[in-house]
């Protein structure tokens, strides 16, 4: 599985790198000195709560839903376009963290839509786990335990 890399260089700009092999999404803010990498498991734990990451002593709210390797593979072009569009906002003097929030919200909406419409491939084994674990939660809210099994499955391929 090839990795997707989208890097934007320059000071005070958003940089984002999506790596399908390791299952890690790495986010870079500002000049790239302060960065934080999130695994799919960590993204899943954010669920609907949003996520605050301390970067350079400041908290940025990162609203994100779990993004799986299968999702990034299926919607690669859409994701890259969303990131490019959000990056263009710098010309309108939108701050880097706001650029990311806009991109994250669009990617989250795309992910939820993909999960709800069944466009993200899930193996029969994982589908059984998914049905058993979700309980009364909305279908796109996944537990950390389930995400571990999905992550292991997709990273193995």
Regions found by a protein language model. Give the residues of each.
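Short, Lys/Arg-rich flexible segments
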Residues: 1-157
């Amino acid at each position: 599985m090839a990795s997707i890399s989208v890097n934007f260089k320059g000071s005070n700009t958003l940089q984002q790198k999506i790596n399908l092999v390791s299952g890690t999404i790495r986010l870079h803010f500002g000049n790239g000195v302060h960065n934080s990498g999130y695994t799919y498991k960590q993204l899943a734990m954010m669920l609907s709560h949003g996520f605050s990451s301390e970067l350079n002593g400041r908290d940025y709210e990162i609203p994100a839903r779990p993004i799986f390797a299968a999702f990034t593979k299926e919607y690669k072009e859409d994701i890259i376009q969303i990131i490019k569009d959000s990056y263009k906002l710098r010309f309108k003097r939108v701050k880097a963290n706001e650029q990311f929030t806009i991109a994250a919200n669009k990617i989250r909406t795309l992910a939820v839509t993909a999960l709800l419409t069944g466009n993200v491939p899930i193996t029969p084994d994982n589908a059984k786990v998914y049905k058993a674990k979700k309980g009364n939660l909305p279908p796109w809210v996944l537990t950390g335990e389930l995400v571990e099994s999905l992550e292991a499955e997709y990273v193995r391929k």
